[in-house]
Amino acid sequence: MEEDDHGGKHDALSALSQWLWSKPLGQHNADLDDDEEVTTGQEELFLPEEQAQARHLFSRKTISREVPADESRSGRVYQTAQHSLMEYSRPTMSIKSRWSFWSSSPKPLPKTPVPSLTSWTHTVNSTPFPQLSTSSGSQSPGKRRLQRLTSMERNGTTLPRTNSGSSTKAMVLHR
């Protein structure tokens, strides 16, 4: 996740936001009757046990504008744009997720929560491995067999997963 590469993605999101906000509704005097709220943030996470890093950029902008009564019974319109860009990478995997949300309403909309990077990386780490089909009996010569491993305590019970960033599952290749 290079800084230069990430900057281009952020510029594309900014261009989309600027386009959305260049389409005002109704006749209004922005200096007198607009209310604006902007939230931006950046999260970064490094998990040394997994040699993984994650980054999350997000922004939310809400504008409340006065409009003629024929456009909105409340006399106001509320516009919201949200953008989120998440990246997760480690030596064997790279995941990118991007979403945008835009709404316009005559009533204030409830704020939707911005996704958290820590909850997203927990989802990535806890994604189960696909079930492997193994035949009972002998294995053909030259074929490899994958075995799913799970960390166990001494009494044979599976260790609970935590959000510490350490993974308790692994795949081992047997020849």
Swiss-Prot record:
PTM text: Phosphorylated.
UniProt subcellular location: Host cell junction, Host plasmodesma; Host Golgi apparatus
Ranges annotated as biased composition (Basic and acidic residues): 63-74
Chief location of this protein within or outside the cell: host cell
Compositional bias of kind Polar residues: 115-141, 148-169
Homodimerization: annotated span: 30-47
Region (Disordered): 58-89, 103-175
This protein's GO CC annotations: host cell Golgi apparatus; host cell plasmodesma
Stretches for region RNA-binding: 50-156
Example GO BP: transport of virus in host, cell to cell
Keyword Metal-binding on entry: no
Classification via Pfam families: Luteo_Vpg (PF01659)
Entry similarity comment: Belongs to the polerovirus movement protein family.
Its biological purpose: Together with movement protein P3a, facilitates long-distance movement of virions in host. Transports viral genome to neighboring plant cells directly through plasmosdesmata, without any budding. The movement protein allows efficient cell to cell propagation, by bypassing the host cell wall barrier. Binds ssRNA.
Other remarks on this protein: Poleroviruses are transmitted by aphids directly into phloem tissue. The virus replicates most efficiently in phloem companion cells and then moves through plasmodesmata between companion cells or into sieve elements for long distance transport.
Domain notes from UniProt: The N-terminus is involved in homodimerization. The C-terminus binds ssRNA. The C-terminus is phosphorylated.
Subunit structure, as described in the record: Homodimer.
Protein name from the UniProt record: Movement protein
